[in-house]
């Protein structure tokens, strides 16, 4: 459970912003969105494979030198 303690004199808006940031860091919102509807195992595998390929492409893109240097 994520808890935020209000500091003395802290506006509620700032505390809400801190709470939202803390919730995003835990990954709770993403998990809740993924659990709202049933996802077939084949669809889940396809989604995970597509995400893994995107991560690989991103990693390769980061390792390449800029065009100006070679």
Swiss-Prot record:
Keyword hit for Cell membrane: no
Any Gene Ontology CC annotation: ribosome
Source species, domain of life: Bacteria
GO molecular function: structural constituent of ribosome
Database matches in InterPro entries: Ribosomal_bS21, Ribosomal_bS21_sf
Record keywords, A-Z: Ribonucleoprotein, Ribosomal protein
GO biological process: translation
Chloroplast recorded as keyword: no
Matching HAMAP family: Ribosomal_bS21
Family that this chain belongs to: Belongs to the bacterial ribosomal protein bS21 family.
Protein name as catalogued: Small ribosomal subunit protein bS21A
Species the sequence originates in: Cupriavidus metallidurans (strain ATCC 43123 / DSM 2839 / NBRC 102507 / CH34) (Ralstonia metallidurans)
Gene: rpsU1
């Amino acid at each position: 459970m994520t808890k935020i303690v209000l500091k003395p004199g802290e506006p509620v808006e700032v505390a809400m912003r801190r709470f939202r940031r803390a919730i995003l860091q835990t990954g709770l919102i993403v998990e809740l969105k993924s659990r709202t509807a049933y996802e077939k195992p084949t669809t889940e595998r396809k989604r995970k494979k597509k995400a893994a390929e995107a991560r690989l492409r991103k990693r390769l893109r980061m390792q390449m030198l800029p065009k100006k240097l070679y």
